[in-house]
Swiss-Prot record:
Residues 45-59 have a biased composition (Basic residues). Residues 36-63 are annotated as: Disordered. InterPro entries: AP2/ERF_dom, AP2/ERF_dom_sf, DNA-bd_dom_sf. It is found in: Nucleus. GO terms for molecular function: DNA binding; DNA-binding transcription factor activity. This is Dehydration-responsive element-binding protein 2C. Keywords: Abscisic acid signaling pathway, Activator, DNA-binding, Nucleus, Stress response, Transcription, Transcription regulation. Residues 71-128 bind DNA. Transcriptional activator that binds specifically to the DNA sequence 5'-[AG]CCGAC-3'. Binding to the C-repeat/DRE element mediates high salinity- and abscisic acid-inducible transcription. Belongs to the AP2/ERF transcription factor family. ERF subfamily. One of its GO terms (biological process) is heat acclimation. It comes from Arabidopsis thaliana (Mouse-ear cress). Gene3D superfamilies: AP2/ERF domain.
Length: 341
């Protein structure tokens, strides 16, 4: 009996692409939510949430070693340790294969993304906090990207409108022809700034040559005498005023007397007789040597003038003091000059 070869058909998972199916469900749910918001109410539930079902993944004793402790919805472990995620379409639809993953956590995230796309806000999620956070981040990035694109387009449009309206000016050529030259607004701004810089340089040169001193002097006179703005002129009393000529004369007298004193000290010659009598006087440093009075020198002391003594009736006989010895003087003690008793 010839053996019959039975061809087993490999189980087909469908000809449709899973990513395309999820995209169609996501667009459908977004359209339903937008229509419910336009009607005046808040976002309404699109359909009934999926049944809770079993969270064990597969029958007891089947699958991998950690399959019995897995609590994620739509996730199960194979015998060789890999994790898979599956989800079923609403109303008893086909089962969608989401892929094979190395951990149950990654498989749970894949199931949550598919559930959000198919069931919308009524989806039952394994990790709602993480899934909602990632969805809000993606939505924010999408909105910011659209806003950036819109701002770029508006900037381009505004720039084109500016160039068309007032950015360029037409200047006729000097050869009296009908040709015109377009000037950019930036060139006009540069020319205006250049003119302002030239005016500023001319002003600085005028101030440097003293042209602006008259205006400053007129301003000071107007401030002192009153500039007509209901301001009374400044008044100073007699005690507060002074004569400038008198002040200059006092300063000149002081300078002349100081110069004469300094000149006398500079022109004075050192006394060499004092240096011969006191050779150690150079050790004093900056001290000037004392001069010994000469017989013919008059220092202007009135109490030593002989003429004044004669006028006052004082007769000074120098001969009485010629034979006088120092020992004959009595200073009120028994000691002599040398300290002996």
């Amino acid at each position: 009996m010839p053996s019959e070869i039975v061809d087993r058909k490999r189980k087909s998972r469908g000809t449709r692409d899973v990513a395309e199916i999820l995209r169609q469900w996501r667009e459908y749910n977004e359209q339903i939510e937008a229509e419910s918001c336009i009607d005046g109410g808040g976002p309404k539930s699109i359909r009934k949430p999926p049944p809770k079902g079993s969270r064990k993944g597969c029958m007891k004793g089947k699958g991998g070693p950690e399959n019995g402790i897995c609590d994620y919805r739509g996730v199960r472990q194979r015998r060789w340790g890999k994790w898979v995620a599956e989800i079923r379409e609403p109303d008893g639809g086909a089962r969608l294969w989401l892929g094979t993953f190395s951990s149950s956590y990654e498989a749970a995230l894949a199931y949550d993304e598919a559930a959000k796309a198919i069931y919308g806000q009524s989806a039952r999620l394994n990790l709602p906090e993480i899934t909602n956070r990632s969805s809000s981040t993606a939505a924010t990035a999408t909105v910011s990207g659209s806003v950036t694109a819109f701002s770029d387009e508006s900037e381009v449009c505004a720039r084109e409108d500016t160039n068309a309206s007032s950015g360029f000016g037409q200047v006729k050529l000097e050869d009296c022809s009908d040709e015109y030259v377009l000037l950019d607004s930036s060139q006009c701004i540069k020319e205006e700034l250049k003119g302002k810089e030239e005016v500023r340089e001319e002003h600085n040169l005028a101030v440097g040559f003293g042209i602006g001193q008259d205006s400053k002097r007129e301003t000071l006179d107007a401030w002192l005498m009153g500039n007509g703005n209901e301001q009374e002129p400044l008044e100073f009393g007699v005690d507060e005023t002074f004569d400038i000529n008198e002040l200059l004369g006092i300063l000149n007298d002081n300078n002349v007397s100081g110069q004469e004193t300094m000149q006398y000290q500079v022109d004075r010659h050192p006394n060499f007789s004092y240096q011969t009598q006191f050779p150690n006087s150079n050790l004093l440093g900056s001290l000037n040597p004392m001069e010994i009075a000469q017989p013919g020198v008059d220092y202007g002391c009135p109490y030593v003038q002989p003429s004044d003594m004669e006028n006052y009736g004082i007769d000074l006989d120098h001969r009485r003091f010629n034979d006088l010895d120092i020992q004959d003087l009595d200073f009120g003690g028994d000691k002599d000059v040398h300290g002996s008793t």
